[in-house]
Each structure stands twice: as structure tokens, then as C-alpha cells.
Curated annotation (Swiss-Prot):
Name recorded for this polypeptide: Calmodulin
PROSITE patterns reported for this sequence: EF_HAND_1, EF_HAND_2
Keywords of this entry: Acetylation, Calcium, Metal-binding, Methylation, Repeat
Record's keyword annotation contains rRNA-binding: no
Positions of the EF-hand domain: 8-43, 44-79, 81-116, 117-149
Binding positions (Ca(2+) 4): 130, 132, 134, 136, 141
Sequence positions bearing N-acetylalanine: 2
Gene: CCM1
Length: 149
């Protein structure tokens, strides 16, 4: 995962890592993580800090070393990319840019993709995604449908 990062990104993350690694021993402890997060206005509990470390602590030693930190950052960046892609896809469907995908907009895009759908099929697609029942799909509903794929 970390091998998809550029040299610039890696040196940027090295800098960030050193900010976390207060004593310079090459590992981030829960205490160091807590200090940095509190300086950023967060107030994580000891358990939350432990969870965050466990999430990326590949060798199970209770701390995060630089390779583990890089994997975490690469994962977070991948998540951001897919969020950007979802926003872009939503904009494609949302022709009038009002923040909602209507049945007409959905039909238009599907037709352009070569999908000939009946009104019933389009209505069914809207109904499946339309959590709040307003007859159109907002961004959150769109994300739910796309992430379920």
C-alpha cells in the first residue's frame, strides 16, 4: 500500500511522524499520539488512542513505527481518492447541480450509458436509494448505494 506514495509524500509523512514521535525513538506511543491529538483540539480517551494504534500496529508491539505509519497514511489517502471520485460521479448525475438526483436526471445518464430503462425501473432505482422518501437521491444516499456495491 505504501509503495503507491510519491517521494514527496513520504518525506512529508516523515516530517509528520517526527512531530508525533516526541522522544525521537522511531515509535509513536499512545502517550505521544494523545499529546499531538490534544494539541489539535481533540480529546481522545486512552481506549480510543489504543484502538487507533492497534488499527495499524502490524507487529503487535503496541506502538506505531514509520512503515506502519506510512501504511496508515496511504490507506487514508486512498479513502480520500474514492470520496473525490464519488463526488465527481454525483456531479455527473446531478445535471442541474441542485444537490439532488431526480428520476429525470437518472434516466438521462442511464440512457447516455446505453441503458434503456422503463419509468418503472428508474422509479425503482430511486426508491431503493431514497432513504428519506423525498423522491430524489441526495449525496449521502448516493454514497450509501455506491459503497454497498
Amino acid at each position: 500500500m505504501a509503495d503507491q506514495l510519491t517521494d514527496d509524500q513520504i518525506s512529508e509523512f516523515k516530517e509528520a511522524f517526527s512531530l508525533f514521535d516526541k522522544d525521537g525513538d522511531g515509535c509513536i506511543t499512545t502517550k505521544e499520539l494523545g499529546t499531538v491529538m490534544r494539541s489539535l483540539g481533540q480529546n481522545p480517551t486512552e481506549a480510543e488512542l489504543q484502538d487507533m494504534i492497534n488499527e495499524v500496529d502490524a507487529d503487535g508491539n503496541g506502538t506505531i513505527d514509520f512503515p506502519e505509519f506510512l501504511n496508515l497514511m496511504a490507506r487514508k489517502m486512498k479513502d480520500t481518492d474514492s470520496e473525490e471520485e464519488l463526488k465527481e460521479a454525483f456531479r455527473v448525475f446531478d445535471k442541474d447541480q441542485n444537490g439532488f438526483i431526480s428520476a429525470a436526471e437518472l434516466r438521462h445518464v442511464m440512457t447516455n450509458l446505453g441503458e434503456k430503462l422503463t419509468d418503472e425501473e428508474v422509479d425503482e432505482m430511486i426508491r431503493e436509494a431514497d432513504v428519506d422518501g423525498d423522491g430524489q437521491i441526495n449525496y449521502d444516499e448516493f454514497v450509501k448505494v455506491m459503497m454497498a456495491k
